[in-house]
Amino acid sequence: MALRYHIFAGTNAQARHLASIMCMEPGEWRYVHSEEGLIGLRGGVVLCYGTWKDFPDKDKVLTRAKINEMHILEVS
């Protein structure tokens, strides 16, 4: 299975929870805990776990990462 999703979350447990909810297969996603992990992505979809509107550096992250596609999800 090819890597398709980058889950931007506070903890690995949150990333695993989101992957489970979305029925993702192992190898289809990876956990990203900081903006440095997003920089340079060329493909795939970034999924955010949590409340993106409360993330203070969201504009900086998007600009530096040059993300192709981003879906903002609020999962509790």
Where are these regions (language model features)?
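Short, flexible loop motifs at catalytic/binding sites
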Residues: M1-S76
